[in-house]
Amino acid sequence: MGRERNKTILTVLLPLMLALLMPSTARAQGDSLLLRYQVRGSVRDAKSGHRLQYVSVSIPGKRYSTVTNSDGEFVLKTNEPPKEVLVSHVGYNSRRAVVTTDGKPLTIRLEPNTIQLKEVLVMAEDPMLILTTALEKVKDNYITTPEMYRCFYRETAQKRSKYIYIAEAVTDLYKTAYTHRDISDRVSVVKDRRLLSPKSSDTLSVKVLGGPTFAVSLDLVKNREFLLNSMELELYSMKMGSPTVIDDRMQYVIELEPGVSIDRPLYYGKIYVDRETLAFTRIELSLDVSNRDLATQFMLFKKPLGLRFKPREQTLLVNYKYEDGVTRLSYVRSTFRFACDWKRRLFNTNFTAVSEVVVTDRDESPSQTIKRKEAYSKNSSLYDTASYTLDEDFWSGYNIIEPTESLEKAVRRLYKEDRRR
């Protein structure tokens, strides 16, 4: 930690979040589930050829899953040779792709779904009625008994286009029934690591408070204080958006925008609701940063004296997946973009902080819980507590979100700089 002694730390706050998690010893579930086989590939739009990001990738009949990265690429590991993968994304027809035996990466092309004219009549529906009915049906649509999820979490910070901080963790998430609040939902870290830029010129670093407890605090269907409650929804103007599909299932799309002026920023966004079950399946939110002072108070937890903070963007994506008659949390991603400068300096510097977590496996009948003493506190940060390591095989045997090309280059750069010291 000596190289970080002169750094100035900027601390930003995720919605609903207090802190990252503290380190812990590995749970017994850890190394016993190391996965030996893998399939690698990319997902593209069949018409445009554009790579598709944050696409759900799973093994049919199994519970292993991941998402594509922002380059549209994925690696999915299993305990036996995979025969095919199932790929699904909002607005596209789902597709099963056969895994080749030669080990070459797959290129999977998804066809955009064409909504029939008769289905556009959904525009006449009442958005508030859909949301209130969906809230009443949460107890029927989501898990009714505790489950244990294996997750992968990553947080990064970039100064302009350069990565200055990377932290990752494999976690266990104990998720209780949606008829209860999240007081018993807990996370324990199986394995984690931290990578930092060793350059002394990186005098400003970013600490994101949020971390692996992401999947507890930002499960918006369970934690309704944030958005999905009648008092909060009354603050928004709503209208029906164009319908779409997720996992080959028709979805209502409800568009939100701030409807009143209050002493805190509200969101623009879309809420997706399964047309048949009325389960929430996807929530996209973007913070209204038009009032810079309010947005700064909302986003920023702590900053050094003399530093000027300019919020640019804060977005949140929460995905749920329908399977075997039950809808479950599958992926959460939060992105901060902001600029900082010091007083009396002419130019400012742009920063981006990203946190994401994906559920990669689940146990529907766990034999144990995560005890309170094993659970991670929400008052710490991986920035402070995760071990610093540059082991190239650190995640061997675990499902993770495949690093993007730019992230891989950043890690390789850190390897080289570390070896030169």
Question: Across the structure, where does each feature detected by a protein language model lie?
Answer:
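A short, solvent-exposed loop/turn motif at the edges and junctions
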Residues: I59, L86-A97
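Short, ordered, surface-exposed loop/turn motifs in non-cytosolic proteins
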Residues: Y37-V39, A46-G61
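A short, amphipathic beta-strand motif
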Residues: Y37-D45, G72, I108, V120
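Short, acidic Ser/Thr/Gly-rich low-complexity loop/linker segments typical of extracellular
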Residues: R63-E73
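Short Pro-Gly-centered beta-turn/loop motif in secreted/extracellular proteins
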Residues: G49, V75-P82
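Beta-strand-rich domain onsets/edges
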Residues: A28-Q38
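Surface-exposed, low-complexity/disordered segments
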Residues: R109-Y236, D247-M250, M299-L300, L305-R421
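Extended beta-strand-rich segments in extracellular/periplasmic secretory proteins, especially
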Residues: R224-R275, A279-S286, K321
